Amino acid sequence: MREILHIQGGQCGNQIGSKFWEVVCDEHGIDPTGRYAGTSDLQLERVNVYYNEASCGRFVPRAVLMDLEPGTMDSVRTGPYGQIFRPDNFVFGQSGAGNNWAKGHYTEGAELIDSVLDVVRKEAENCDCLQGFQVCHSLGGGTGSGMGTLLISKIREEYPDRMMLTFSVFPSPKVSDTVVEPYNATLSVHQLVENADECMVLDNEALYDICFRTLKLTTPSFGDLNHLISATMSGVTCCLRFPGQLNSDLRKLAVNLIPFPRLHFFMVGFAPLTSRGSQQYRALTVPELTQQMWDAKNMMCAADPRHGRYLTASAMFRGKMSTKEVDEQMINVQNKNSSYFVEWIPNNVKSSVCDIPPRGLSMASTFVGNSTSIQEMFRRVSEQFTAMFRRKAFLHWYTGEGMDEMEFTEAESNMNDLVSEYQQYQDATADEAEYEEEEDAIQE
């Protein structure tokens, strides 16, 4: 079967990851001890995408947990599903990365990376036909960003033909945890552009807004934010784990979403988002789901899709529904908002349908879009980066770990290139594309 190996790094990654396993265990009917306690055979049919079956009939997540300090790991271990993970798959240091990308990537992280890779290899060898890796991390700290990107590049070397999917939490525009976030994020993006296949871009502020505005939570906790993320994560892979009429997997997703190799940063959304109290009072319809799914307020990163155009998009629907209706709704969205889709990629919205809805809902949908407006995120980080880098503020923390200023300059220009690539394709029209081809022909 097509297994996915899950890796979580740093405090943010481990907190999202542990929430994700709660959701997936719940979907597959696996209790906190790893025993199956579900009600339907469908839960077990492809349980091996995310789980290994141990000799005594227990299901063990294909998860690798890493961090440079023991704190978060301890709380995962004592959390509700802490006992389900394989104890050898916890890999942690003692020193911490102190929000320093260089520590995660070059010094502390580099010392720990080999023991992480050993665990990854062991897990990969346990797979029948490994499809790819999914990595949860944040880009603002030290471990998730520095060591996370180091691990991604090492895995890329060793498994060049497997998919590499990341769920990356970007620094938020208004809420900042650390001053050096722009540095860490820019250095990470520099790596992700080259080594990842698909990046789902998340950020806390957009998630807060969803909790506050849509879910009517007055004081959202990180647990609430992570629950939103894990609903999306589970939605992206539901087609692999449950039978459906139109299946998609990580590679199909990439083929349909990535027109140019560097432009693989996606916005994600989830529907239905209703506050916990009012869920049972409304029946859901496919048109409602579709409408909410495309709504800018539903996007889990602080970029507004109305400020750009969609190169491509993909929607995964879950639940019993007619594929014909799904197709009609998707075509409807494109026809009504044609100015928000680039016209030089016809039929650029793909949909897939999986028959099993998430727990407690009759139907749901997950949205993944490749929109040029994601450049707003990069632009914002880049401006903050430049403001500090111009004065060489905080640089000594990085050069002290053996980094060179040159690396910062490279990362900065790579990110600015990315922004202008998005801008270029946002402005491109179908006639222009033909015109350019003619020009090339003349020059040849």
Swiss-Prot record:
Essential cofactor(s): Mg(2+)
Molecular function per GO: GTP binding; GTPase activity; metal ion binding; structural constituent of cytoskeleton
PROSITE patterns: TUBULIN (PS00227), TUBULIN_B_AUTOREG (PS00228)
This protein's UniProt keywords: Cytoplasm, Cytoskeleton, GTP-binding, Magnesium, Metal-binding, Microtubule, Nucleotide-binding
Description of what induces expression: By gibberellin and brassinolide. Down-regulated by abscisic acid (ABA).
Any one Gene Ontology BP term: mitotic cell cycle
UniProt superkingdom: Eukaryota
The UniProt record lists the keyword Glycoprotein: no
Tissue spec: Expressed in roots, leaf sheaths, anthers, and suspension cultured cells.
Annotated Mg(2+) binding sites: 69
One Pfam family linked to the record: Tubulin
An annotated GO cellular component: microtubule
Function in brief: Tubulin is the major constituent of microtubules, a cylinder consisting of laterally associated linear protofilaments composed of alpha- and beta-tubulin heterodimers. Microtubules grow by the addition of GTP-tubulin dimers to the microtubule end, where a stabilizing cap forms. Below the cap, tubulin dimers are in GDP-bound state, owing to GTPase activity of alpha-tubulin.
Assembly description: Dimer of alpha and beta chains. A typical microtubule is a hollow water-filled tube with an outer diameter of 25 nm and an inner diameter of 15 nM. Alpha-beta heterodimers associate head-to-tail to form protofilaments running lengthwise along the microtubule wall with the beta-tubulin subunit facing the microtubule plus end conferring a structural polarity. Microtubules usually have 13 protofilaments but different protofilament numbers can be found in some organisms and specialized cells.
Record-given protein name: Tubulin beta-6 chain
The species this protein was found in: Oryza sativa subsp. japonica (Rice)
Gene from which the chain derives: TUBB6
